[in-house]
């Protein structure tokens, strides 16, 4: 009987410890809506902007999910802050040719965008 009680206590302890570790792990996952400026109206399918943003950010270590909302001019990113900082995410977006909050788009990357994705003159 004592062994059975000890086994139950050990299992409960293991469950509580693993729950704590799981909660600790998720604490490092953050989501941010980054303000940008998207000029084309077919952003999700355009390989020069929306599709490229999704593909490039998805391949970045530490980024879990991305979503481009052309109407709201936002890029929502879920990331693991142990692997990448929000500032690094903004710089990555800038290097793709788009503003990212206060980080301005890299001019050489903007030049490579399709005309529909550039600011109208």
Question: Could you tell me what each predicted segment is?
Answer:
Residues 1-30:
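Bacterial Sec-dependent N-terminal signal peptides
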Residues 38-57, 116-117:
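Short, thiol/selenol-centered motifs that function as redox-active sites or metal-ligating centers
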Residues 51-56, 85-87, 95-98, 120-121:
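Short, low-complexity, polar/charged sequence segments that are solvent-exposed and flexible
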Residues 53-69:
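Short acidic amphipathic segments
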Residues 65-109:
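Mid-chain, structured segments of secreted extracytoplasmic proteins
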Residues 111-121:
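Short, low-order "capping/linker" segments at domain edges
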């Amino acid at each position: 009987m004592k062994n059975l009680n000890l086994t139950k206590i050990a299992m409960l302890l293991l469950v509580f410890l693993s729950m704590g570790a799981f909660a600790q792990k998720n604490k490092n996952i953050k989501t941010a809506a980054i303000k940008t400026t998207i000029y084309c109206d077919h952003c999700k399918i355009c390989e020069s902007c929306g599709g490229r943003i999704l593909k490039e950010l998805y391949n970045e270590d530490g980024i879990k999910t991305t979503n481009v909302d052309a109407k709201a001019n936002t890029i929502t990113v879920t990331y693991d802050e142990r692997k990448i900082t929000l500032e690094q995410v903004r710089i990555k977006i800038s290097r793709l040719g788009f503003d990212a909050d206060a980080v301005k788009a890299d001019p050489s990357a903007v030049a490579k965008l399709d005309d529909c994705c550039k600011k109208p003159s």
